[in-house]
Structures are given as C-alpha cells and as structure tokens.
A protein has these predicted regions:
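Bacterial Sec-dependent N-terminal signal peptides
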Residues: 1-24
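Generic anion/oxyanion-binding catalytic loop in active/binding sites
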Residues: 11, 43, 550
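Generic marker of residues within folded, mature protein domains
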Residues: 12, 63, 356, 476, ...
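C-terminal outer-membrane/trafficking sorting elements
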Residues: 495-575
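Surface-exposed repetitive/solenoidal architectures
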Residues: 23-492
C-alpha cells in the first residue's frame, strides 16, 4: 500500500480564469457602522461581507473597542490596492486582535500597506485564531526595520494560523519577514500547542535579517510550537538568515515542502535558515529546482545546531560561497551541525570562493560539519572550489567534519568518488557499516559494494539500519529516479486520521492521478469523486470504482487541488 504525502506544492488556483464569479466592489476608504450580521459568539460570529465592514474590524481593534470576538467572511473583498487606500492592519502594539477570524475560503485582494508598525492583514494578534484566509494581489511597501511583516499576520503571539494562502508583492523593509507571518511567538503553559499549519506562500521575499516563506522568525518562551503541512513556492533572497519555511528561531517543523530558491548573505536552508536550539525537522523535502546558496548552506537546514533532522530529503543543488575570513560550509541536508538520521540527498553540493582566503571550507553530501549522522545516503556530486585558497579545506561524500564524540553509522553513497569517502574527525576514519552502492538488476534496486546487516540490497540495509522495516521503500513510481524513498509516512493533510480510506499518487502529478483504496474491499463501482480548488469551486467530477482507479487531471492548470472521495478529502498538486 502506498502512503503518499498528500499535500501541497506548485502554483495555486487563482491563476485560472473565472475564480471570482461575481463582480466585487472595491473599498471606498470608509468604515461601516455595523457588521452584516451575527453577535460575535463562536456559534454566530460577526459576518463581514464588504471591505468597509473589514475596516470596521480594524478600527474597533486598533482603538481597543473590539477585536475580541469571532468574525467570519461571507464574501470576497477588494481593498482597492492603491496609495489612497492604504490598509491599516488589524491589531497594533497597544491593542492586539484577540478573537477568532475565519476567512471562510473567500479572497481578500488588492491589500496595499505603506505605514504600519506590524504589517499584514493583521498587524498584531494575541491568543487568537486566524484560519482560511486568502490574501491575493497584495502590495506591502511598509518600511519598519525593527518590525515584522507577513501578508496574513505581522506579529502573532499564541495564535493558531491555519489554512492560509499569501500571494502578492512584499517590497517593504522589516527585520522579520515571512510570507504568512513575520514574527511567530509561543509563550503558553507547556501543555499548550500552537499551530501554524496547512499554509501556502507564493510571495517572493527580499529579507533584511530573518526571512522565511512561511514565518520570518519563530520564538518559543513556554509551550509547544508545531509548524506543519506548509509549502513555500516563493523565492527568498538577501536576508542574513533565510529558510524556505522559517528564517530562524525555535520550532518543530513537520511535513513541509519548499519549492522556492533560497539565497542569503550568511545562512540559508531549504526548510530552515538557523535553528536557535533543540528542536526537530521531520518528513520535510526541499525540491528539485529549489537551489540553496549562502556562506553556510544546507538543503534542509543551514545551521542546525542540536536540531533533530529525520526522514528529510533534499533534491536541489546546494552552494556555499564566501570570501576572506569566512567559514564556508555546505551540506546536502545541513550546512553545519544537527542530529541527522534516515535522510537522503540527491542534489550536487558546490563551494565557491569569491576572493581572498577563507578561514575554513567544509563540504559534505549530507553535512558540511555535523554531529550525529546515521543511516543516510547521498547521490549528489561534491564540487570543490578550483582553488580554496586555504589549507583548512575538507570534503566528504557524506560529511567533511564531525563534532566531538559523534554517533555515526550506515553511510551510503552512489558510485565512485575521487574525494575521501570517510568521516573527518582529525584524522579521517572509516564509518561503521558504510560503503558505496551501484545499479542493480532493475531501475529500483541498488547493490551495496559490501554486505551490511547480511544484505547487499540498499533499501533492505536502510530499513535494517533504521530498525524499522517500513521507513524506506523502493521507488516503484520512479519519482526519485529509482532511488529509495520514504515508506511509512503517516497520512497528512486534510485526511490525516486513521479513517482515511484511500491514497493518491504520484503527488505531485504530471497529469494522471492514481487512486488506491485502503478498504478491505474495493470501492463501490459508482463512487463519485469531485475535484475542487482551495476556494471550494468544483472543477472536475466523475465516478471511480474498484481497488485502483486513475483520474486524468491533465486539463487542470499547475496548482494545488482537493480530491473529495468516499467521505474523505486529500490535497494533491498538478505540476
């Protein structure tokens, strides 16, 4: 049975014609006297049907006379998008939004921001919930070097942000900049978990200090933060610490994907730029065209510190570049540090010395310099600089440098290399249970040069090394060029409960989506399916039946969609 990651990736919906079915009247700059209905309770939230009523929420919140109830959009809104109609974000430093807001899958378009303390649809939220918000065609020109910018929320404290989408331009200046939220803070009793989940960013970011596709900077004082099922599609450049999902901070990140290029002046990672302390990054992927570049650069994390990185994959090129006195590190999974297990790298790892004499150059297929590295494989090439201009230059197929007393085991690499295949720890030493592998008898089998755990099959050896026979599986669908992929991944996305009754693959797809039942019996022959965009509009429907069925989705534009079938819903992406 195929357990496929059922979520996100590539361009969303609003690119398709006819997304807005009705003509929307844009904001005239005024403020409504009342909401369209409701009493502000959870069961009967205030109804917001016009831009003027949304401006009423901003006015009440920012003057301390409201913003502490529940609100719901009942129609799409246009905020005019011009200099004469600059949006004042909901919530200020003095008066935060403390209620619950449901965008109800409607769109808020043409938001224009020029002068705000915290920039976004919401400026500052506290103990709040923001969900189902679609910000599109936004223009953020706010300049506040000490501030926080996010198209959905600027600064969010103890705020659950769920199922939000950002599209537009962020041309402003802020120290913390994220496509969804600029500064994400958790300060609650330890039993509480705050979620940032099911969000997608399309915005290109030009960071000043911290920049992330989903969150610029995340911070935990007390409590638990979980960032999960999020996708970044925007490119991120210029910041000091940049990541496809989070620029830097404290967090737990699970089931996230990056498709955007990440380039910084210092530390870059496909998922995270820098982790401040202990944490975890699991079941995350940096995809093919999402190249990573920085002085310290990693396909998953730039500077991982004590972070656990497990079941993660990088498929893009990683380039570390620097000049005089720089410490240059590059790794397919982590540029530096981290506790890495059950991961693989498919991207080339390159180092460029721009000029002068760097202090250190370290390059590895998994990590430039790290702590624990266990049960991993690398197929990417290691491309050293033509002249490192330093005697402190080390290269490794898996790791160039290791910390004191590391845990290392089961390193596998594809083909033959001229560089040293062993771990470097002053001096080089042979890592236990490690060797090269080459092609087997089929496109999905790979043979170890030396038997490990009594087998020469790479996939079997990886599972034995993981002490779990389900973590790795053969790439039956050839989505990874036949190299082993992760197998036992819990169902994710909208249908993540044990009751999910079907799988879809490949995901993303180029045109044909296969549907396979998890039932003990086949699907009913006349079971109806429905494909919608994220606004809930039906784009395609039909009937499927049997143990396996295929649906032709080649007529859909590139983007993310929902497949509704047999009482469950899963996300899939068309490339």
């Amino acid at each position: 049975m195929r357990n496929i990651r059922l979520y996100t990736l590539l361009a969303l919906l609003l690119m398709a014609g006819g997304v807005m079915q009705a003509q929307i009247t844009c904001w005239d700059g005024s403020v409504a006297e009342a909401y369209a209905g409701g009493d502000g309770t959870t069961g009967n939230p205030y109804q917001i049907a016009t831009a003027e009523q949304l401006a009423l929420l901003a006015q009440q919140t920012n003057t301390g006379s409201g913003g502490n109830a529940c609100y719901i959009l009942t129609d799409s809104i246009c905020l005019n998008g011009s200099e004469g109609y600059s949006w004042q974000p909901i919530g200020t430093e003095e008066y935060a939004f403390t209620g619950c807001f449901d965008g109800n899958q409607f769109t808020i378009k043409d938001m224009y921001i020029t002068n705000a303390g915290f920039s976004g649809l919401f400026g500052n939220t506290l103990n709040a919930t923001v969900r189902n918000v679609r910000v599109t065609e936004a223009m953020d020109n706010n300049v506040n070097p000490q501030g926080a910018d996010g198209l959905v929320v600027g600064k969010a404290t103890n705020t659950n942000i769920i199922n939000c989408v950002s599209m537009g331009l962020m041309n402003g200046i802020a120290s913390k900049q994220g496509g969804i939220v600029g500064h994400f803070i958790v300060d609650t009793p330890e039993a509480d978990t705050i979620f940032l989940k099911d969000c997608v960013n399309h915005v290109n970011l030009y960071g000043m200090l911290y920049a992330g596709g989903i969150a610029g900077y995340s911070e935990i004082t007390n409590g638990v933060m979980s960032i999960e099922h999020c996708v970044n599609l925007g490119n991120i450049t210029n910041g000091v610490m940049c990541g496809g999902i989070v620029g830097a901070g404290s967090f737990s990140i699970r089931y996230c994907d990056n498709y955007g290029m990440v380039s910084s002046n210092s530390i870059s990672g496909g998922i995270v730029g820098q982790r401040d302390d202990f944490g975890e990054i699991v079941f995350c992927t940096n995809h093919d065209k999402a190249s990573i570049q920085g002085e310290i650069a990693g396909g998953i994390a730039g500077a991982a510190r004590q972070t656990k990185i497990a079941m993660c994959a990088n498929r893009a090129k990683v380039t570390a570049q620097g000049d005089s006195n720089d410490w240059i590190c590059a790794g397919g999974i982590a540029g530096a540090d981290g506790k890495i297990s059950n991961c693989y790298n498919r991207g080339d790892v390159e180092c460029l010395v721009l000029y002068g004499q760097p202090e250190v150059v370290q390059m590895g297929g998994i990590t430039g310099t790290g702590g624990n590295v266990v049960n991993v494989y690398n197929t990417g090439a290691i491309i050293p600089p033509e002249n490192p201009h330093t005697n402190n230059a080390w290269y490794g197929i898996i790791a160039a440098g290791l910390s004191d007393d590391p845990t290392v085991d089961n390193w596998y690499w594809f083909g033959e290399y001229d560089i040293n295949p062993y771990g470097f720890d002053w001096p080089y030493y042979l890592v236990p249970g490690s060797c090269a592998f080459n092609e087997g008898a089929s496109a999905t089998t790979w043979i170890l040069d030396e038997a490990q755990y009594g087998t020469t099959d790479l996939t079997e050896a990886l599972n034995l090394g993981a002490m779990n026979e389900c973590i790795w599986k053969e790439d039956e669908d050839l989505t990874n060029d036949g190299f082993p992929v992760f197998g036992a991944m819990p169902p994710v996305g909208l249908a993540e409960q044990e009751t999910q009754l079907f799988d879809v693959y490949p995901n993303p797809t180029n045109g044909i989506l296969f549907v396979e039942t998890r039932r003990a019996t086949s699907l009913p022959a006349a079971n109806e399916y429905r494909i919608t965009n994220l606004l809930g509009q039906t784009l395609q429907s039909g009937r499927v039946g049997g143990e396996m069925h295929q649906i032709d989705v080649s007529g859909l534009p590139s983007g993310m969609y929902l497949l509704n079938l047999d009482g469950a819903t899963v996300k899939f992406v068309v490339k």
